[in-house]
Amino acid sequence: MNDRPPTPLLDTVSTPEDLRRLKPADLRQLADELRAEMISAVSVTGGHLGAGLGVVELTVALHYVFDTPRDVLIWDVGHQAYPHKILTGRRDRIRTLRQGGGLSGFTKRSESEYDPFGAAHSSTSISAALGFAVANKLANKEGRAIAVIGDGAMSAGMAYEAMNNAKQAGNRLIVILNDNDMSIAPPVGALSAYLAKIVSSRPFLSMRGFAKRVAQKLPRPIHDFAKRSEEYARGMATGGTLFEELGFYYVGPVDGHNLDHLLPILENVRDGDHGPILIHVVTNKGKGYAPAEAAADKYHGVQKFDVVSGVQAKAPPGPPSYTGVFADALVAEAKRDDRICAITAAMPSGTGLDKFGKAFPERSFDVGIAEQHAVTFAAGLAAQGYRPFCAIYSTFLQRAYDQVVHDVAIQNLPVRFAIDRAGLVGADGSTHAGSFDITYLATLPNMVVMAAADEAELVHMVHTAAVHDSGPIALRYPRGNGVGVALPAAPERLAIGKGRIVREGKTVALLSLGTRLGEALRAADQLDALGLSTTVADLRFAKPLDEAMIQTLLTSHEVAVTIEEGAIGGLGAHVLTLASDLGLIDGGLKLRTMRLPDAFQEHDKPEKQYAEAGLDAESIVATVLAALHRNSKGLEESA
């Protein structure tokens, strides 16, 4: 049963201003009700549950102590922001999370003044908060900037780049390190909480600053010894030496579920003159919901579920997922070839490489949230004769574009890019859409770019990439399940730059790349019914193009249409360039390009997103009819 829980105290809180009217003694009850409301809401919508459960008390404490939205609160990634949304005027829509027309699953500037900076990709919060803090400093405006970042996100270099530049913000910048994997600190107790309260206080920080100023006037050897001694002592007590070296005052570790600990420490930091400050808060992902606490992934991402049992709704049986097909195909290749390695950037299960890791742990590398390193690491392996597959979501490969260009393409190193989540991705929306990889990869010399039309094609492309040693190669495939075709008993090596004719006709040529092939075939049925004989080609390659086949199709049909799940500048642009180079456009060629719109599309079901983008069968038919000046019945329209 998923009945809504009683929340009498939470019902009185619509905004943080309401929250700040409560007594501190009421906050424990509020946190419990907030947690229950979040569990109830996500049970209806699905989404990211575990991270939000882990920061309920921290969210309450931050909005209680700080004057949001004047004090800006920036959540890294945003998976943990559901409690924040409930407390900031969006509770009435919380059961629309990740639904078409509903709330985003991440923070979003256009959604609320309490979301000062949008997020979805990792490790951006400190840089953004630093920008807000320095802007306030330059304008002599009141207001702190608080970044909440998880310990996993601290594996990305960008977080340290920001911290290395943060000193200029002074006490206007506060970083909350949400350690929910116990990867940095041991369990916290009363002593560490007491020490954290002491070291966050104004007298301690003032005395420490005074001692530093005195030490700087001592002879150099004595000054250096004093500095090392203080760091050693504080490092033993708190583990904060690294952050101190980056110019932060370190406070913690603190029990992130104990409001009696959190409130005075946050108040001390708020009222202090010293900074920037890093508060190390230890939390438990999935806190307060037994099924989540017992699960290996702490219910990080869930389907709709029953609140009482925690049992998640299962999707109806269907074809295997593209991710699963890729993983199985790569494992099969690795069994035949011990030069094959697999690299992921903190997404082993999301990319399917957890299967590879179990089969070949010595050839599997999870480098953390470090896409730039992942690509150059793969380049180094390739330079030594190995066959690395770098499996990264399309949206995250954007973070390593310079490495793709400088370290891979220019040196023509045979790195294999397995690009998951290509095209539109549904509930995760614009921040996770794989819209741009065709454009930014196909423009590079030496690069080969493939797109699988179905799961069988994906198996062939994994094999083709595995044995391709003459330069870098990428294969892209979408989120979700395949179309249900039989998988090949043995993979084939595809000829580089060669497409295939799936259906032959005479009047219309549809040139499809990737999984829009199914819609192209549906459109062909409709066009044939209107008396317009239609050829459908699966180009397979965005680069190099099958120039001979494309030239034949363009010159032997009345109209040709390219169809792709990518942004402007991709397949269509390359086909137009080819037609121009061959002089085909001089003779009145009717060529149309269908691609994603020049806009960031909001979250919705993928099929609705593609219909909105004009990439469904009906839109293809309409494009053809318009090019031929025919009406919806296929009849010629008078000029």
Swiss-Prot record:
Gene3D superfamilies: 3.40.50.920, 3.40.50.970. SMART domains: Transket_pyr. Pathway: Metabolic intermediate biosynthesis; 1-deoxy-D-xylulose 5-phosphate biosynthesis; 1-deoxy-D-xylulose 5-phosphate from D-glyceraldehyde 3-phosphate and pyruvate: step 1/1. Its EC number is 2.2.1.7. Mg(2+) binds at residues 151, 180. Binds 1 Mg(2+) ion per subunit. Binds 1 thiamine pyrophosphate per subunit. Its cofactor is Mg(2+); thiamine diphosphate. One of its GO terms (biological process) is glyceraldehyde-3-phosphate metabolic process. InterPro entries: Dxylulose-5-P_synthase, THDP-binding, Transketo_C/PFOR_II, Transketolase-like_Pyr-bd, Transketolase_C, Transketolase_CS. Thiamine diphosphate binds at residues 79, 120-122, 152-153, 180, 289, 371. Keywords: Isoprene biosynthesis, Magnesium, Metal-binding, Thiamine biosynthesis, Thiamine pyrophosphate, Transferase. It is an enzyme of class 2 (transferase). One of its GO terms (molecular function) is magnesium ion binding. It catalyses: D-glyceraldehyde 3-phosphate + pyruvate + H(+) = 1-deoxy-D-xylulose 5-phosphate + CO2. NCBIfam families: dxs, PRK05444.2-2. Belongs to the transketolase family. DXPS subfamily. PANTHER family: 1-D-DEOXYXYLULOSE 5-PHOSPHATE SYNTHASE-RELATED, 1-DEOXY-D-XYLULOSE-5-PHOSPHATE SYNTHASE, CHLOROPLASTIC. Homodimer. Catalyzes the acyloin condensation reaction between C atoms 2 and 3 of pyruvate and glyceraldehyde 3-phosphate to yield 1-deoxy-D-xylulose-5-phosphate (DXP). This is 1-deoxy-D-xylulose-5-phosphate synthase. It comes from Rhizorhabdus wittichii (strain DSM 6014 / CCUG 31198 / JCM 15750 / NBRC 105917 / EY 4224 / RW1). The lineage of its organism: Bacteria, Pseudomonadati, Pseudomonadota, Alphaproteobacteria, Sphingomonadales. The gene is dxs.
